[in-house]
């Protein structure tokens, strides 16, 4: 599958220009293809069966999505075998994976790991990702915070709390300079890494002087990936332990910090699109149900109290769409406003997804609380996604700091 950049998003936007947040024809075509695949290969019964069995990623589905549809290479330039598309197209796929609660490492490999590698220019790994031959994951906890808006996207302004400056739990030994490769031995444990179980390559930020980003073969001796209990069983987390494992350096110093910061920022922005997809699916399911469910000889959706609740959800979902689309447009254009747009989108979409999923469960009545109904999958996806890569309150606190407002309580 190939796609082309829309003329309104290619390159950096001129100062003051307003991006077109509408979906282009190419984006809608991409959506239709991805939705058809997920509806066919990952319907609710299949997802529920996978969760019941305690299985992690659906690798056959991921291979089809990554290699056959080319979604793994959307962000990768054509010179490395990718589609040369933008974050706008990547956001469309994220929306659909959220809508289906798909058990695929799209966010962690095709977005976060790819964004980090684009910052290093490693053609070999980028080519492997674009072809679908390799899957990668950034060895950072899924709760890691992207750079704050006042960092200017560098990742260097907040040290270990927010951004890419560290400290990181993996320590890098002195590189072996005998063959000029710079390979270093890595030791440490990273907790709660998303996408680690499916990854062939781990991108490991190594704390040291200088700070470096390393590529590690996930199958190498000394690498242990232990699944951990996660609220969202459709996106399994793992603790990754490295015991004297060789790591090939990809970037050093500020280049490495920028690569990791780019991965976290892109991940948060595309997770906002995924959360919007969850919210929109929950709203659609609920509206359909209250139209069909009758009580007192009339559809329950005709009751004013339910109308008001669903109207509130619709407003939240619509706002989340606008914020997520703006963040995707800023990422696509390399806009200086990207950190602000991503923080706004992550906060808005996280809240909207949780609200929509909660109302989906409650307004479905008794059936909404059963294991056989998919509402609980969407609720867990919504809640875990809202906590990943910065909670809504943490992102709002970062935005408040820009205008010297106090953060929300508890931040």
Question: Which residues does each predicted region cover?
Answer:
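Alpha-helical interface subdomain recognition
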Residues: 1-98, 265-411
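Short clusters of hydrophobic/aromatic residues that line enzyme substrate/ligand-binding pockets
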Residues: 23, 106, 186, 223-225, ...
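Short secondary-structure junctions
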Residues: 169-172, 221-230, 246-252
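Glycine-rich flavin
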Residues: 45-224
């Amino acid at each position: 599958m190939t796609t082309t950049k829309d003329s309104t998003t290619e390159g950096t936007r001129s100062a003051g220009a307003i991006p077109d947040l509408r979906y282009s024809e190419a984006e809608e075509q991409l959506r239709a293809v991805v939705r058809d695949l997920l509806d066919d290969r990952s319907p609710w019964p299949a997802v529920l069966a996978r969760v019941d069995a305690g299985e992690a990623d659906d690798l056959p589905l991921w291979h089809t999505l990554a290699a056959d549809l080319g979604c793994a290479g959307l962000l990768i330039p054509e010179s490395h075998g990718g589609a040369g598309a933008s974050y706008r197209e990547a956001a469309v796929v994220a929306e659909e994976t959220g809508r289906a609660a798909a058990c695929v490492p799209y966010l962690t490999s095709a977005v976060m790991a790819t964004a980090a590698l684009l910052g290093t220019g490693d053609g070999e790994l980028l080519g492997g990702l674009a072809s679908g031959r390799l899957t990668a994951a950034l060895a950072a906890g899924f709760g890691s915070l992207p750079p704050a808006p006042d960092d200017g996207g560098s990742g260097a302004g907040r040290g270990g709390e927010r951004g890419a400056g560290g400290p990181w739990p993996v320590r890098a030994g002195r590189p072996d300079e005998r063959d000029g490769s710079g390979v270093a031995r890595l030791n440490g444990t990273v907790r709660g890494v998303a996408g680690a179980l499916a990854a062939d390559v781990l991108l490991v930020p190594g704390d040291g002087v200088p700070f470096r980003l390393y590529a590690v073969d996930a199958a190498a001796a000394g690498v242990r990936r232990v699944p951990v209990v996660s609220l969202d069983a459709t996106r399994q987390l793992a603790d990754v332990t490295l015991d004297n494992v060789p790591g090939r350096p990809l970037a050093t110093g500020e280049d490495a910090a920028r690569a990791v910061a780019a991965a976290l920022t892109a991940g948060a922005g595309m997770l906002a699109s995924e959360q919007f997809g969850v919210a929109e699916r929950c709203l659609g399911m609920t509206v359909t149900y209250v139209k069909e469910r009758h009580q007192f000889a009339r559809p329950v959706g005709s009751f004013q109290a339910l109308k008001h609740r669903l109207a509130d959800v619709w407003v939240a979902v619509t706002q989340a769409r606008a914020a997520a689309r703006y963040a995707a447009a800023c990422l696509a254009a390399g806009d200086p406003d990207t950190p602000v747009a991503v923080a706004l989108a992550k906060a808005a979409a996280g809240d909207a997804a949780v609200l929509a999923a909660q109302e989906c469960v409650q307004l479905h009545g008794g059936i909404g609380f059963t294991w056989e109904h998919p509402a609980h999958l969407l609720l867990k996806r919504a809640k875990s996604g809202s906590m990943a890569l910065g909670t809504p309150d943490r992102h709002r606190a970062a935005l408040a700091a820009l205008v010297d407002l106090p953060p929300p309580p508890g931040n």
